[in-house]
Curated annotation (Swiss-Prot):
GO biological process, one term: defense response to fungus
Disulfide bond positions: 18-24
The keyword Transferase is annotated on this UniProt entry: no
Organism: Rana boylii
Keyword annotations from UniProtKB, A to Z: Amphibian defense peptide, Antibiotic, Antimicrobial, Cytolysis, Disulfide bond, Fungicide, Hemolysis, Secreted
Protein name: Brevinin-1BYa
A Pfam family recorded for this sequence: Antimicrobial_1
Localization annotation: Secreted
């Protein structure tokens, strides 16, 4: 797993989770 992808996932993961689950 690429470090860049890992950092992107860490950065955008919570936002995606927020949008999908509507739990912000």
């Amino acid at each position: 797993f690429l470090p860049i992808l890992a950092s992107l996932a860490a950065k955008f993961g919570p936002k995606l989770f927020c949008l999908v689950t509507k739990k912000c």
